[in-house]
């Protein structure tokens, strides 16, 4: 059975979710476990990892409550203010929740593109290992050049890059992204989520072959031990159904060995997040 390593839930609020633009109207509504669980069952998915959207500790409360009520949610990636003076105290607080596995900051939205390298931010990252937490790196491709230095500073900290670092699949731009993500992948404490690809493609005219060059790069760079499958529910709905989105990776990995497929669809996410 497969585990979906990346999805979201929210109670839609136009002010809080201003990033959901007019052209993304398909996701301008509430998305909750009752909406997602039937989709998982239809697609042979046995569990999932719920990832933060809002950058508040209220978001953690919301996610942890859903995880407590829904057994299919095997882990939660929350948010804390990594630059706060009391960061260690906040990390200690969340240890009481067995399903809290790691944290994420929406670096892709920061005006300071190199925020990850700022001393206060790095101080927060430095504390994660003590409590056994992972860190999800959410960035755009222009930030990959800082990411190599960032992950090199914490060789014992587990990181995972979300959504292949969002290459421009629509315009088939690959060269600079390829060079940068290969450099990051040299650090063996870094994994990559093969997730969210359709949202970086031409939403209305994408073809499966659009994704192959990017998948080739990531699989070769990270190997089959450091990649994991994620859907990015419900964001992919702007461009595909779950079945259409998953068929991209099902088709691509169909020629891989059973063991390699098992790693990608299940084992790696369990090992990474200690599910």
What positions do the PLM features span?
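Catalytic pocket-lining loop regions of alpha/beta-barrel enzymes
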Residues: 115-228
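Active-site glycine-centered loops adjacent to acidic/histidine catalytic or metal-binding residues
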Residues: 232
């Amino acid at each position: 059975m497969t585990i979906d390593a990346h999805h979201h839930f929210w109670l839609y609020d136009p002010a809080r979710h201003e990033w959901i633009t007019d052209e993304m109207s398909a996701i301008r509504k509430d998305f909750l476990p009752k909406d997602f669980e039937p989709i998982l069952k239809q697609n042979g998915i046995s569990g999932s990892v719920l990832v933060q959207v809002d950058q508040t500790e209220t978001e953690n409360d919301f996610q942890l409550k859903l995880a407590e009520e829904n057994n299919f949610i095997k882990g939660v990636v929350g948010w804390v203010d990594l630059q706060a003076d009391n960061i260690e105290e906040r990390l200690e607080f969340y240890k009481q929740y067995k399903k809290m596995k790691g944290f994420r900051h929406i670096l892709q939205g920061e005006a300071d593109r190199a925020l990850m390298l700022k001393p206060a931010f790095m101080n927060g990252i430095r504390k994660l290992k003590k409590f056994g937490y992972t860190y999800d790196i959410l960035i755009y491709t222009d930030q990959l050049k800082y990411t190599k230095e960032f992950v090199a500073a914490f060789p014992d900290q587990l990181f995972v890059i979300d959504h292949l670092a969002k290459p421009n699949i629509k315009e088939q731009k690959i060269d600079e992204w390829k060079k940068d993500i290969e450099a990051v992948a040299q650090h063996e404490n870094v994994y990559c989520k093969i997730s969210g690809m359709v949202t970086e493609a031409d939403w209305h005219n994408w073809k499966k072959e659009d994704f192959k060059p990017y998948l080739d790069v990531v699989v070769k760079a990270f190997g089959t031990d450091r990649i994991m499958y994620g859907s990015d529910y419900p964001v992919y709905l702007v461009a595909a159904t779950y079945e259409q989105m998953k068929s991209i990776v099902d088709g691509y990995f169909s020629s891989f060995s059973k063991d390699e497929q098992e790693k990608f669809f299940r084992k790696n996410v369990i090992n990474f997040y200690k599910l």
